[in-house]
Amino acid sequence: MKIEDLDKKYCVGLGEILFDVLPTGSQLGGAPANFAYHAGQHGLHSVAVSAVGSDLLGDEALRLLDEKHLKYVMPRVDFPTGTVQVELDAEGVPTYDIKEGVAWDNIPFTDDIKEVAANAGAVCWGSLAQRNEVSRKSIYQFLDHTPNDCLKVFDINLRQNFYTKEVICESLKRCNVLKINDEELITIGRLFGYPGLDIENKCWLILGKYNLDMLVLTCGVNGSYVFAPGFKSFQETPKVEVADTVGAGDSFTGTFCASILKGKSIAEAHKLAVEVSAYVCTQHGAMPVLPEKYTK
């Protein structure tokens, strides 16, 4: 597929596309597609980059993306379209059983994908899509072809055992923004040899060590932080009636990046991201339509 109307404000979600099989039914998801969808709701050109199978689920994935008016570059490959069994606990918090050997493990770096990279204003990727070497190499090639001023967001998204210290290190070197949650921060602290530091000191350490422009830390009901050199923003988490939390973090990241690209301050972008994420928690599935008050 040829991508039209690319400009320097293009927001790219790069990595897995899959069906979350929830107790209430199947929902199209995958953090990168969720990110692109939510960035797009804030008026930015956005595109999801992944791969789907030459199967009925692949057809359905592309149909649903079309239905949601989300542009995509997704080669059809000889692997099944990705699925995840999602179980929700009493608070609506998900656990995942992620099927292996699927299409998004085998994303090729095509000319169309290269063209998207060259025109990216922001790109968001995670650790999960790097579990297989084929997609990992394509992600690195994509990042290598982005403009110098591209917002490169590593939304770490640790899932099950699908990550290594080496993969995390490589992405930390390639990003200029890290998005992480409090549980992942504990894992990273243990992995990288500074488990004793408190939350804020861990964040300042990572920010400086990898020369990041920003570090976004979400702590569930305990609020969220954005750290930048010489600057810290904290926002409390609004109390809402939770339907499920699937995709809430991606809506946060998509909203935050879109706001930064539109010229909002870090504090303004952070505040809106918190409000949108809280709203998404009140809805079923990862890609609800946002009310106009959040997107105008």
Residue positions per predicted region:
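Glycine-rich phosphate/adenosyl-contacting loop at the front of the ribokinase-like
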Residues: 1-70, 84, 242-243
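Structural motif
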Residues: 10-12, 121-122, 151, 214
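Proline-centered loop/turn at the N-terminus of a beta-strand
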Residues: 45, 151, 177, 213-214
